[in-house]
């Protein structure tokens, strides 16, 4: 089922102690990441799983005032989370890229909420995760809740 809302409203679906997966590489859902970080003072113990979180200086949830709000589990330690992990507020998870979908599916890495980017749905309701679909498909399949801003730069799947 598709529901449209604002990023701030969608971020309210994230609860304390949830496990949140954030799509990486060139498809980081920046508007959702910011909306989640903006709720940092309301949240506690949110486990943030990310891979290839490149392209920014530091993730907005990696701030001292959020040290009790967000614990980072990085599947690839990139510049946006490196200092946060070095300060002890997160951990690196050593895994081959091809093994990670199995970790999601077996529940070893649980996903309550997946923050992804997607294309506009086609006539049949299908979306594309674009060029960063490496872990997005398995994350979407395993998450209890999927939140994705509709990206008009992602190609829409033909019907």
Language-model region placement:
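Hydrophobic alpha-helical hairpins/lids featuring a short glycine-rich hinge
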Residues: 84-147, 151
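Short, acidic Gly/Pro/Ser/Thr-rich loop/turn segments
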Residues: 55-56, 121-123, 155
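A broadly conserved detector of short glycine/acidic/proline-rich loop/turn motifs that flank catalytic sites
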Residues: 26, 52, 76, 96, ...
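N-terminal active-site beta-alpha-beta segment that forms phosphate/nucleotide-binding
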Residues: 1-79
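Conserved small/polar residues in nucleotide/adenosyl-binding loops
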Residues: 153-159
